[in-house]
Amino acid sequence: MRPSLQPLGLRCRLSVLCAGALLGLLSGCSLLPQAEPNDVYLLPGGVSPQASGGPAVDWSLRVAKPQANQVLDNSRIAVLPHGSLISSYKGARWSDAGPVLLRDRLLETFQADGRISSLSSDDRQLQADLELVSDLRAFQSEYRAGQPEVVIRLDVRLVQSASHKIVAMRRFEVRQAASSARVADVVAAFGQASNALAGQLLTWTLQQGQLQARNLR
């Protein structure tokens, strides 16, 4: 006796019906987690282009992106809610990695001042007399007595490009209280702290760069 065979067309129709039923069962659920929407923040409070009026220096400077650990070298907005626990603000992120934002703020500040006219970044490996290299140790908000405070800590080295010799080094730390625990207010405090640190670093770099230039004469 021959085995009973279903016509090919019937088998195809049954397969389509089964697939459709399966898709209908799955349509009410998601097999993959939905991406959480993020608010993307620029680092606020950029300086207005305003020259210092002081004489231009005769040396060039390259500003390198600060080195940082994996917690800080990303676009998450870091927060220490208590103790040594580090987290990030849910549903919010920076427009770029923290070290890039800080380097660009330094460049903006130096360019607006105008005294270091021969200025470049490590994005373009142009020749420069001195290089500003650094390690970003903190770029986060920390809660103090229930209120957020932004902390930026940067270990800086001024290096002779030709000899790779460190000619000056210093730690900079700025703290800026946020006006509230709202993410937008914490972000505003990041901008204020970054501006303050950039101003301090500009003054120090000019002093150390001029001292180094005199020593080379």
State the predicted function of each range.
Residues R2-C18:
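Bacterial N-terminal signal peptides that target proteins for export
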Residues P66, D135-F139, E173:
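Generic short beta-strand segments
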Residues A112-L119, T203-R217:
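Surface-exposed helix-capping loop/turn segments at secondary-structure junctions
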Residues S30-P99, Q208-R217:
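A structural "domain/chain start" motif
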Residues L85-R93, A162-T203:
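Short secondary-structure boundary motifs at beta->alpha junctions and helix caps
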